[in-house]
Amino acid sequence: MLSGITTNRLMDSMDALDTILKMQREYMEMIDSRRIGERREERISKLCTAIIHEACELQNLTNWKWWKSPSIFDEEKAREELIDILHFVIQISIELGMDAKDILSAYARKNAINRERQLKGY
């Protein structure tokens, strides 16, 4: 069991992640591959740039600009921007040859490291 997650819930999560990976692969088949780049490193670099820009779009929905009058936070738009980021993160996972099991395993490993750091006052 992973941090209190039941086996059934873990399998459901894996199925959901598999579905997301499949949907992303199918979506990328629709895009002219020459637009994103020939080399894997180039594709990953462009995807990282896309993540940065989408993260800025998400940040712009918050009231981080102290010099401007605050606006109402649009949670629905924020969710949309977050999913845009997820598209690019999932595509990088695919570029790195990761499947749902690889993603979960790497996440669990890094999560354990982060938890240990917190326990040590990081």
Where are the model-predicted features located?
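Flexible "arm" and connector segments at domain edges
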Residues: M1-Y122
